[in-house]
Amino acid sequence: MKRTFQPSVLKRNRSHGFRARMATKNGRQVLARRRAKGRTRLTVSK
């Protein structure tokens, strides 16, 4: 049986990366929340 998680760095960054977050208003809200919380890593991208 094929598993559901087939890792791909490109797909990961396109959907959850920093530039993807910055592209929408809600994505920017996500970053703002994570900054306020003090997260070391704001997004999955390096």
Swiss-Prot record:
Cellular component, GO annotation: ribonucleoprotein complex; ribosome
The name this protein goes by in its record: Large ribosomal subunit protein bL34
Protein encoded by which gene: rpmH
Presence of keyword Phosphoprotein: no
InterPro entries, per database record: Ribosomal_bL34, Ribosomal_bL34_CS
Record Pfam families: Ribosomal_L34
Listed PROSITE patterns: RIBOSOMAL_L34
Record's keyword terms, sorted: Ribonucleoprotein, Ribosomal protein
Family to which this protein belongs: Belongs to the bacterial ribosomal protein bL34 family.
Entry annotated with the keyword Ribonucleoprotein: yes
HAMAP family for this protein: Ribosomal_bL34 (MF_00391)
GO biological process, one term: translation
GO molecular function: structural constituent of ribosome
Species for this entry: Photorhabdus laumondii subsp. laumondii (strain DSM 15139 / CIP 105565 / TT01) (Photorhabdus luminescens subsp. laumondii)
